Design a protein with these regions (language model features):
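Positively charged n-region of N-terminal signal peptides that target proteins for export
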Residues: 1-4
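N-terminal signal peptide c-region/cleavage motif recognized by signal peptidases
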Residues: 13-15
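N-terminal structural module
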Residues: 19-75
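Short aromatic-centered micro-motifs
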Residues: 32, 147-148
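Mid-length scaffold segments of soluble, non-membrane domains
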Residues: 65-143
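Short strand-turn-strand beta-turns centered on an Asx-Gly dipeptide
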Residues: 150-152
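Flexible glycine-rich active-site/ligand-binding loops centered on an Asp-His dyad
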Residues: 155-181
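Cysteine/selenocysteine-centered motifs that mediate thiol-based redox chemistry or coordinate metal-sulfur cofactors
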Residues: 180-209
Length: 209
């Protein structure tokens, strides 16, 4: 019995390395890689279309987890917003939804200043289809800028910090895609399967048939 107990205890660190969100395993920690230090999961949630259709699981990774949205946005440290697709969606639809959400969260001056980079980011998504289970991420590399990765391949980079700050507002800003989603990825007590607030469905992503 003592041996069995010791064996079970020895497995605990490994069992704690992933979190299950809608039966999808989300890593609690990302190991250091080229240009990114080790990152810890701050929070994760499922984004739904009209509160019913799951689109993706979003997971926010930080060097130092925090539930303070302003701190997440302003701190000049490595970050990753990772997405695991729950259904097939055209990348351009995701790009369009991002563009709409940015318009909601930025004032006219900010939007005008960032529009060239926003257009470049939209172009990086291309017209491919992201399939169920596909993983993509938007990374912030300190001193460099925003990096888009899709299917394990880097699609491009955009310099500076302002664009990534704006992108984070889509999920944790004053008008996020969902209040529940925001609370969950900030490590709050909201349910992991956070659904859209009805007033925010204008930023929803339509799935492919």
């Amino acid at each position: 019995m003592r041996l069995l107990t010791l064996c079970l205890l020895s497995l605990l660190p490994f069992l704690a390395q992933a979190r299950s969100i809608d039966q999808i395993e989300i890593a609690e920690r990302l190991g250091a890689e080229h240009e990114l230090p080790a990152l810890q999961l701050n929070g994760a949630a499922t984004r739904y279309f009209f509160g019913m259709v799951p689109v993706y699981i979003g997971a926010l990774y930080l060097e130092q987890p925090t539930n303070n949205s302003q701190q997440v946005i302003t701190q000049d440290s490595a970050k990753r917003m990772q997405f695991v697709m729950r259904r097939d969606v055209r990348a351009r639809k995701i790009a369009e939804a991002l563009g709409d959400a940015l318009s909601t969260n930025l004032d006219e001056s900010e939007l005008r200043q960032l529009q060239p980079q926003i257009d470049q980011l939209m172009a990086l998504y291309g017209n491919v289809t992201l399939h169920t289970g596909d993983i993509s991420s938007l990374d912030y590399l300190p001193g460099q800028g925003t990096r888009l990765i899709m299917g394990g391949q880097e699609k491009g980079r955009l310099p500076g910090k302002a664009l990534y700050d704006a992108l984070l507002k889509v999920w944790i800003g004053p008008s996020p895609v969902s209040r529940e989603f925001k609370a969950a990825i900030l490590g709050g007590a909201a349910p992991a399967s956070a659904r859209f607030d009805s007033a925010e469905n204008k930023n929803s992503v339509k799935a492919t048939n």
